[in-house]
Regions:
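Aromatic-rich carbohydrate-binding modules that target alpha-glucans
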Residues: 2-51, 57-85
Length: 85
C-alpha cells in the first residue's frame, strides 16, 4: 500500500490570466492550475508524507495563498506550508 496522498491546491484569483504552484515537493518547477467558472484556480498532486513549502505565481508575480497556512523559512521568506500525514 502506498503512503502517498492526494493534495489539492486552490487559489481564488478570478481576474488572473495564469496561475502556477511551485514548491519543494516538485523542485520548484511550475505546475499549472486550471480555472473554473467562479475564478477558482486548482490542481491535484500526489505527495508522500512530510512538510512542504510552496508559493504561487499569479500572472508571473510571486504570491502566497491567504487561505492556507504559512511560515517563515530559514532565509526569512514567507511561504505557504502543507503537511501531508
Amino acid at each position: 500500500m502506498s503512503d502517498k496522498k492526494r493534495v489539492y491546491f486552490r487559489l481564488d484569483a478570478p481576474k488572473a490570466g495564469a496561475v502556477v504552484v511551485l514548491g519543494d515537493f516538485n523542485g520548484w518547477k511550475q505546475r499549472v492550475l486550471r480555472q473554473d467558472k467562479k475564478g477558482q484556480w486548482a490542481t491535484w498532486t500526489t505527495l508522500t508524507p512530510g512538510r512542504y513549502e510552496y508559493r504561487n505565481q499569479v500572472d508571473g508575480e510571486w504570491s502566497n495563498d491567504p487561505e492556507a497556512p504559512a511560515a517563515f523559512n530559514e532565509f526569512g521568506s514567507e511561504k505557504n506550508v502543507v503537511v501531508v500525514g
